[in-house]
From Swiss-Prot:
Gene it is expressed from: thiM
GO biological process: thiamine biosynthetic process; thiamine diphosphate biosynthetic process
Origin species: Bacillus velezensis (strain DSM 23117 / BGSC 10A6 / LMG 26770 / FZB42)
HAMAP family per UniProt: Thz_kinase (MF_00228)
Protein family according to the UniProt entry: Belongs to the Thz kinase family.
Entry keyword Metal-binding: yes
Protein name, as recorded: Hydroxyethylthiazole kinase
SUPFAM superfamilies: Ribokinase-like
Pathway field: Cofactor biosynthesis; thiamine diphosphate biosynthesis; 4-methyl-5-(2-phosphoethyl)-thiazole from 5-(2-hydroxyethyl)-4-methylthiazole: step 1/1
Lineage, uppermost ranks: Bacteria, Bacillati, Bacillota, Bacilli, Bacillales
């Protein structure tokens, strides 16, 4: 897995124009759809339980996001997830806020138990909660000090949940339990845009739809998305998050394979 592989995955997404079915939250639906369109994928958001399963079976990937959940939406997600499983469609899960409330935690757990997930993306606290380590804390204040802990969390969660885990933060860590990568792309302005992480989860879905290897697809998606953010920040750092949000969409559309390869900062984590 290297920079060129990430760039090639971007080309595959644009060539294949995969249909990404995102059952996401109502705060980020529009931004997510526009981000997928900019990247070169085709978004669809079918939330009704009456059609969620039917849409999932014809999609290239299914993305489940519990940001603004309800009992009905959880049931629709599970129905869609089971349909995706039956039809060989990769399922990517974003356990937004897992651990914040009993209902949110139980909903995340139910989805994990009933749907076979290809990948899960979240921040360290969310991943720790769904992995059964809710008291886990990052030791240290920067990526260098905390890196080992995040790597171990990603590996443990991936092995325990039998899926690819992507923990995003200052340094992103992606693992399937056996192989682990750190991605050093992105920009701090991403933290000022609501839905930036949710869009990334759907971008991972697009890359998984276009590639066979889920770990490589997830690493590639995180790197390309972060690289687009870096390019957007260069053009808007003097303006602020509003301009950055729009420019991020522009850069997702315009980033070239060469730029993606040149900017990719992917490191394979080797155990010492």
């Amino acid at each position: 897995m290297d920079a060129q592989t990430a760039a090639q995955h971007l080309s595959k997404v644009r060539d294949q124009n995969p249909l990404v079915h995102s059952i996401t939250n109502n705060v980020v639906t529009n931004f997510t759809a526009n981000g997928l369109l900019a990247l070169g994928a085709s978004p669809v958001m079918a939330y009704a339980i009456e059609e969620a399963a039917d849409m999932a079976k014809i999609a290239g990937a299914l993305v489940l996001n519990i940001g603004t959940l309800s009992s009905a939406s959880v049931e629709a997600m599970i129905a869609a997830g089971k349909s995706a499983n039956e039809n060989g469609v990769p399922v990517i899960f974003d356990p937004v806020g897992a651990g914040a409330t009993p209902f949110r935690t139980a909903s995340a757990s139910k989805i994990i138990q009933e749907v076979r997930l290809s990948a899960i993306r979240g921040n360290a606290a969310e991943i720790a909660n769904i992995a059964g380590a809710p008291d886990w804390k990052i030791k240290g204040v920067d990526a260098g000090e905390a890196g080992g802990d995040v790597v171990q969390l990603a590996k443990t969660a991936a092995s325990g949940l039998k899926t690819v885990i992507a923990i995003t933060g200052k340094t992103d860590v992606i693992s399937d339990g056996a192989d682990t990568y750190a991605v050093h792309n992105g920009d701090k302005l991403l933290t000022k845009v609501t839905g930036a992480g949710c869009l990334l989860t759907s971008v991972i879905g697009a890359f998984c739809a276009a590639g066979q290897d889920v770990l490589q697809a997830a690493v590639s998606a995180v790197s390309v998305y972060g690289s687009a953010a870096q390019l957007a920040a260069l053009d808007t750092s003097h303006k602020g998050p509003g301009s950055f949000q729009i420019e991020l969409l522009n850069k997702l559309a315009s980033i070239s394979e060469q730029e993606a390869a040149e900017l990719a900062a992917i490191e394979r984590v080797i155990e010492k």
